[in-house]
Amino acid sequence: MNATDMDTEAAFRNDHETIAGEDPFAMFGEWLELAHRKEINDANAMALATADPDGLPNVRMVLLKGFDREGFVFYTNTESQKGVELAENMQAAAVLHWKSLRRQVRFRGTVNRVSAEEADAYFVSRARASRIGAWASKQSRPLENRTALAKSVATEAARFGISDIPRPAFWTGFRIVPNCIEFWMDKPFRLHDRLVFKRSHSGEPWSALKLYP
């Protein structure tokens, strides 16, 4: 079922629907489109999990900024905690949970940097203040106070003036290339519907199976 064909209350009738499909990326696109219509804020927000060198996981919310048949893309400062952890361990997992839909999608796999051209194209699409912020913020490092951050922003704004703001070398995008994608739909009495797609490597066909809730 295409999300655009669903009436405004369809998301709340999970009780009578089941998850079905053969193409996880197409299914994700339909669910995300519906979420953009129903969620109050940031339907593309996802919890991203990485791990430090000791294997201790860290998780934080980031924004999914794109997806295609290769994977799911987000952007960050490479000197941030997640950037440093990804440099050591290029694997990650993420989940998007939509309370208004009573649905979620989670995926995991290897992580690759996007091309410089792709990162540049996205960076230039950001608001000018956000581009300045990318230069001003020493992400994940100690901050004395908000005044110090404001001064850093002012310094970078003065440095660039009205000129173009290039993408910092320490700021780029990452693509999670999934080997597992699971769709979850809430059902009464915790008898939820789960459909998982798996593959060994990118480009291989997906196998799909239902899971007990």
Curated annotation (Swiss-Prot):
Binds 1 FMN per subunit. It is an enzyme of class 1 (oxidoreductase). Its EC number is 1.4.3.5. Substrate binds at K65, Y122, R126, S130, R190, L191, H192. InterPro entries: Pyridox_Oxase (IPR000659), Pyridox_Oxase_CS (IPR019740), Pyridox_Oxase_N (IPR011576), Pyridoxamine_oxidase_dimer_C (IPR019576), Split_barrel_FMN-bd (IPR012349). Keywords: Flavoprotein, FMN, Oxidoreductase, Plasmid, Pyridoxine biosynthesis. Its cofactor is FMN. GO terms for molecular function: FMN binding; pyridoxamine phosphate oxidase activity. The keyword Isomerase does not apply. Pathway: Cofactor metabolism; pyridoxal 5'-phosphate salvage; pyridoxal 5'-phosphate from pyridoxamine 5'-phosphate: step 1/1; Cofactor metabolism; pyridoxal 5'-phosphate salvage; pyridoxal 5'-phosphate from pyridoxine 5'-phosphate: step 1/1. Homodimer. Catalyzes the oxidation of either pyridoxine 5'-phosphate (PNP) or pyridoxamine 5'-phosphate (PMP) into pyridoxal 5'-phosphate (PLP). This is Pyridoxine/pyridoxamine 5'-phosphate oxidase 2.
